[in-house]
Amino acid sequence: MTNLRKSHPLMKIINHAFIDLPTPSNISVWWNFGSLLGICLIMQIITGLFLAMHYSSDTYTAFSSVAHICRDVNYGWLIRYIHANGASMFFICLFLHIGRGMYYGSYTFLETWNIGILLVFSIMATAFLGYVLPWGQMSFWGATVITNLLSAIPYIGPTLVEWIWGGFSVDKATLSRFFAFHFILPFIITALVMGHLLFLHETGSNNPTGLNSNADKIPFHPYYTIKDILGFIIMMLILISLTLFSPDLLGDPDNYTPANPLNTPPHIKPEWYFLFAYAILRSIPNKLGGVIALVLSILILILLPLLHTSPMRSLTFRPLSQCLFWILVADLITLTWIGGQPVETPFILIGQVASILYFSILLIFLPLAGMLENKTMKF
């Protein structure tokens, strides 16, 4: 009798994806973040579901309902803070996952990479919508400022903004639809994740050398399941420590003040994981130009396979490109810091220089470095 996991139609899919999957024997800890992202997604859906049971998407009661969850619901405070800080863990894993894909040349798997970019946009949209729901000062003004950017789109902009708002300002209709979208998007993300995995398993995983590893593969279970469990334990330790000891470390104190349309906070800023894109948006004086730069800061990832000029896939054996990659990482950290600073003299200039450097490295310097490395290899 054949093994059930190899014969049953449903078990067969799970078996091919997580048990008997042929995996390169040399993939490092950087390949852990895909599974960690899956765990983060499941965790966010479960905690979000429990929060949705008690949340009220009405402008008069939204803030109070969040306070009620924290005060009166059994372990409501824990569920709420795991959900809020879980989003931060999600983005940390996401940025590391994208960084690994860029460093080791995983963008040459075109379908997997492009679905990944769709996932980034969907996750960012979900996080933005979720930030609006507690209906604090930063929620309200963040929603107003970010949705207002769409008015920069020529001809249809102002109508589009009013259509999204469901009126002439951010109000009850806006909050209701944002809640509905925030609830449905994680399930769309789950569907995209399945597509992402499907295309990945068509080609097989990349590895640190960037070479074909068909001659040297091992089953996913038990080797990489054990490795993933270790990553999961470390991530959960960090998340639980953050949630229990310093739950508001990554939040904004302004969001503990109920939304007031008549009082603008001195410094409107999004959550930390959007600050790099926000800094790029602010560094361009023109509204439409800023919006285009904001979208391009993520959309530029689509061009990476076209800008790949080296015969070597990975950066493992390319020291010049490695230097540029780490300058890019430092540049993104600088942009994140600038996004959280007020719009004042030194910060404006630093933001503009960092924004120009970000696009220059990806569009000009990395392809040139690849060409130069080709030349040096021929000597």
Curated annotation (Swiss-Prot):
Which compartments is it annotated to reside in? Mitochondrion inner membrane
The coenzyme or cofactor needed here is: heme b
A Gene Ontology molecular function term for this protein is: ubiquinol-cytochrome-c reductase activity
* Cofactor annotation remark: Binds 2 heme b groups non-covalently.
The membrane topology of this protein is: Multi-pass membrane protein
Q: Which BP terms from GO are recorded? A: mitochondrial electron transport, ubiquinol to cytochrome c
Entry's Gene Ontology cellular component terms:
mitochondrial inner membrane; respiratory chain complex III
User: Any idea which positions bind heme b b566?
Assistant: H97, H196
The alphabetized UniProt keywords are: Electron transport, Heme, Iron, Membrane, Metal-binding, Mitochondrion, Mitochondrion inner membrane, Respiratory chain, Transmembrane, Transmembrane helix, Transport, Ubiquinone
Q: Which residues are recorded as binding a ubiquinone?
A: H201
Residues reported in the UniProt entry to bind heme b b562: H83, H182
| Listed transmembrane segments | 33-53, 77-98, 113-133, 178-198, 226-246, 288-308, 320-340, 347-367
- What is the protein's major site of localization? mitochondrion
Q: Which InterPro entries match?
A: Cyt_b/b6_C, Cyt_b/b6_C_sf, Cyt_b/b6_N, Cytb/b6-like_sf, Cytochrome_b, Cytochrome_b_C_euk/bac, Cytochrome_b_N_euk/bac, Di-haem_cyt_TM
Q: What does this protein do?
A: Component of the ubiquinol-cytochrome c reductase complex (complex III or cytochrome b-c1 complex) that is part of the mitochondrial respiratory chain. The b-c1 complex mediates electron transfer from ubiquinol to cytochrome c. Contributes to the generation of a proton gradient across the mitochondrial membrane that is then used for ATP synthesis.
Misc remark for this entry? Answer: Heme 1 (or BL or b562) is low-potential and absorbs at about 562 nm, and heme 2 (or BH or b566) is high-potential and absorbs at about 566 nm.
Q: How does it assemble?
A: The cytochrome bc1 complex contains 11 subunits: 3 respiratory subunits (MT-CYB, CYC1 and UQCRFS1), 2 core proteins (UQCRC1 and UQCRC2) and 6 low-molecular weight proteins (UQCRH/QCR6, UQCRB/QCR7, UQCRQ/QCR8, UQCR10/QCR9, UQCR11/QCR10 and a cleavage product of UQCRFS1). This cytochrome bc1 complex then forms a dimer.
Q: Which family does it belong to?
A: Belongs to the cytochrome b family.
Please give the name of this protein: Cytochrome b
Annotated source species:
Rhizomys sinensis
Instruction: Give the classification, highest ranks.
Output: Eukaryota, Metazoa, Chordata, Craniata, Vertebrata
